[in-house]
């Protein structure tokens, strides 16, 4: 389109282009053209299509392609100059990639093919491409004589019996290049699942920034080499850490049906109850609720009015709870707050707070509080234009981000159906290699798995029972030397299982006791993300295992059409330690407990049994482990972040916060939480798995996971 030949550039006045642009962009595609956008289009069309731009059919074709890409990227209704430049750059990148692929295909040398004409004579393709010697060949002539200047008498002569053969070869050479495009050749290619299977550490994950004004995601190229080596984030990364997470959550919330009603029927005293009912009933109630969010800066001077605020819950320097959004912060009063159950309210969580604003003291009295409702993965991908955020289907550039083609997604789903035999094995956490009890359990498990080697085996740390630091152990050797010897022992054990080391991809994810974060934290929760185990300890393992990845924490696996997140963290322990206790809830719990004790003290044994049965029948008494696991999963996925805490609780590397974001939520989240029991839950289409601890008494536990069916089976091996 952009290389149609030599043209004479011209300067087109925007009013001259307006009728054509109106017919194509406005009437056909429903776009509204701004004056600066029309000027940018005029400059490009004048320099590309020249003086004959009105009569050139490529001009109309360009405008149609431009409008199609604009609609695909969901850039909005108004065509401005910035968007015009971005779309034109993307079109150029696409054409450049297509031309490069065509040139690569054209540069493939033709293969020599042998033909038999049926009469016993064998003829090769080289015979038709080589001119037969003739008496005139000995005559001297100019060396630069072209093939068009050769007389017919000097041209290559072909026998009559070889004419059908020559026609066949000519058709085979010319037809594919003429009739089949590179896209069609890609569609006809058989997909190899290994091309769409990749383990992505945090250092390899692509970084994207979010523009809240345009509501678009942009690719951020890596930093220069000096800053990458120093690994020093700048101050801008600190401010973007909160803003990006807040705006992503806000835009996700505004896409919810409860916030898209045009009816101005906002009733703050019942909005939280209505929102909760809509979430529980999957938005089956069509009654408009008219929910709207108010920025904190707009509360000034509006004393005694009801509002709904979206902000980060944290404690201010005065020791009071406050809410903070992009416009400011305000102190809150939670003495009469009724929170939605089934969630962990922790410092750093983004919450929806409903209440009354008082000018005196600039305080917001919260009456109810909940989390922003979650969103399914497919809906989020549709909103962002099916961007390939993992970089599996193409290479990112500053002006171009590859997308997930719908046809490729369907083909990958079909390929998953043919790979139902593939499975992932998730060994429980705390694989202490310095514990002989653990090593015996590993040997038993590997013996069983070697009979039918899985596709992936994931080993979760910590791999040492004590933090690895610069100190001498009880054996008068350094802890680092002992740590290395433990991995050498593991490598020696794996060498006995040929199927595993040859056909299985081994993934090792560090824990809080593993270097080098253990030098600073001494076993406590360190900063995230955590880098992989250093290569100094992995040399022997790399020699034994053909496919091994020393992963970071967290890490991501791209498996065909799915995204799997692996994360090792004691999340439940942190939530229990730092959750906010609301006075109304605690007082109600204390009253119920006191009333129950009083009734049991005043009743006989028979009456007590009846009383307990009545209490159990009135309340849905689920096991505490089930309730805790549900709260953990809902808290993580609704927050859209693996560490929704403030920096004082869980530090985060400022420039690596994008590796902890769950936007969109993954297909599967594997959370190795040693402070919680093993579980597997599905919430908003995301399968969440916790393998639990590896050793339980004399049992070695692990989980088999089939990605296609998302089926989980817990296995136990006694030893």
UniProtKB/Swiss-Prot annotation:
UniProt-annotated location(s): Nucleus
GO molecular function, one term: single-stranded DNA binding
A GO BP annotation: error-prone translesion synthesis
Location of region: Disordered: 107-147
Gene Ontology cellular component annotations, sorted alphabetically: cytoplasm; epsilon DNA polymerase complex; nuclear replication fork
Keywords for this protein: DNA replication, DNA-binding, Nucleus
Additional detail: In eukaryotes there are five DNA polymerases: alpha, beta, gamma, delta, and epsilon which are responsible for different reactions of DNA synthesis.
Function summary: As accessory component of the DNA polymerase epsilon (DNA polymerase II) participates in chromosomal DNA replication.
Family: Belongs to the DNA polymerase epsilon subunit B family.
Assembly and binders: Heterotetramer. Consists of four subunits: POL2, DPB2, DPB3 and DPB4.
Protein name: DNA polymerase epsilon subunit B
């Amino acid at each position: 389109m952009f290389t149609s030949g030599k043209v004479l550039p011209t300067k087109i006045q925007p009013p001259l282009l307006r009728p054509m642009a109106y017919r194509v962009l406005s009437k056909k595609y429903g776009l509204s053209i701004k004056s600066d956008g029309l000027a940018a289009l005029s400059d490009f069309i004048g320099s590309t299509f020249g003086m004959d731009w009105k009569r050139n059919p490529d001009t109309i074709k360009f405008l149609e392609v431009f409008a199609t890409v604009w609609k695909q990227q969901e850039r909005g209704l108004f065509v401005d100059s910035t968007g015009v430049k971005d779309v034109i750059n993307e079109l150029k990148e696409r054409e450049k990639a297509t031309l490069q692929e065509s040139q690569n295909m054209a540069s493939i040398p033709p293969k020599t093919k042998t033909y038999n004409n049926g009469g016993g004579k064998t003829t090769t393709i080289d015979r038709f491409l080589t001119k037969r010697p003739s008496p005139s060949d000995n005559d001297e002539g100019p060396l630069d004589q072209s093939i068009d200047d050769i007389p017919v008498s000097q041209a290559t002569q072909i026998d009559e019996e070889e004419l059908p053969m020559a026609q066949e070869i000519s058709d085979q050479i010319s037809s594919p290049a003429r009739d089949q495009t590179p896209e069609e050749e890609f569609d006809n290619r058989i997909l190899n699942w290994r091309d769409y299977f990749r383990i992505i550490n945090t250092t390899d994950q692509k970084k994207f920034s979010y523009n809240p004004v345009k509501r678009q995601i942009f690719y951020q190229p890596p930093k220069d080499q000096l800053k990458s080596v120093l690994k020093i984030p700048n101050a801008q990364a600190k401010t973007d850490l909160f803003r990006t997470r807040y705006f992503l959550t806000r835009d996700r919330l505004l896409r919810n049906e409860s916030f898209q009603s045009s009816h101005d029927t906002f009733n703050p005293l019942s909005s939280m109850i209505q929102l909760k009912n809509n979430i529980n009933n999957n938005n089956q109630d069509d009654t408009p609720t008219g929910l709207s969010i108010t920025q904190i800066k707009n509360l000034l001077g509006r004393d005694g009015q009801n509002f709904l605020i979206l902000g980060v819950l944290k404690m201010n320097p005065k020791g009071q709870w406050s809410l903070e959004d992009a416009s400011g912060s305000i102190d809150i009063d939670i003495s009469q707050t009724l929170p939605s159950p089934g969630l962990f309210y922790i410092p750093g969580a983004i919450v929806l707070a409903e209440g009354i604003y008082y000018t005196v003291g600039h305080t917001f009295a919260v009456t109810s509080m909940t989390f922003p409702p979650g969103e399914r993965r497919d809906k989020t991908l549709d909103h962002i234009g099916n961007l390939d955020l993992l970089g599996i289907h193409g290479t990112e550039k500053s002006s171009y981000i590859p997308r997930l083609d719908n046809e490729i997604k369907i083909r990958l789903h079909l390929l998953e159906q043919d790979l139902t035999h593939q499975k992932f094995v998730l060994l429980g956490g705390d694989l202490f290699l310095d514990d002989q009890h653990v090593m015996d359990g590993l040997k038993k498990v590997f013996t069983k798995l070697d009979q039918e080697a899985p596709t992936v085996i994931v080993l979760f740390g910590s791999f040492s029972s004590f933090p690895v630091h610069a100190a001498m152990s009880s054996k008068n050797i350094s802890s680092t030397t002992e740590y290395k010897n433990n991995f050498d022992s593991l490598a020696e054990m794996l060498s006995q299982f040929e199927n595993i080391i040859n056909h299985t991809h081994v993934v090792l994810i560090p824990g809080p006791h593993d270097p080098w974060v253990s030098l600073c934290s001494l076993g406590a929760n360190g900063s995230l993300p955590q880098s992989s185990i250093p290569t100094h300890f992995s040399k022997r393992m790399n020699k034994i295992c053909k496919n091994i990845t020393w992963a970071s924490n967290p890490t991501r696996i791209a498996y065909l059409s799915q995204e799997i997140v692996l994360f090792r963290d004691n999340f439940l322990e942190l939530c229990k330690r730092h959750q906010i206790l609301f006075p109304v809830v605690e007082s109600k719990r204390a009253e119920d407990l006191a009333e129950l004790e009083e009734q049991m003290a005043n009743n006989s044994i028979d009456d007590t049994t009846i009383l307990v049965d009545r209490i159990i029948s009135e309340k849905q008494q689920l096991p505490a482990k089930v309730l805790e696991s549900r709260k953990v999963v809902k808290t993580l996925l609704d927050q859209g972040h693996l560490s929704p805490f403030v920096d004082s609780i869980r530090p985060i590397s400022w420039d690596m916060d994008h590796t902890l974001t769950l936007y969109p939520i993954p297909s599967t989240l594997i959370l190795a939480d040693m402070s919680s029991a093993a579980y597997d839950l599905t919430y908003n289409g995301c399968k969440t798995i916790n393998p639990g601890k590896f050793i339980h008494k004399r049992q070695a536990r692990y989980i088999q996971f089939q990605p296609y069916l998302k089926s989980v089976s817990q296995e136990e091996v006694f030893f």
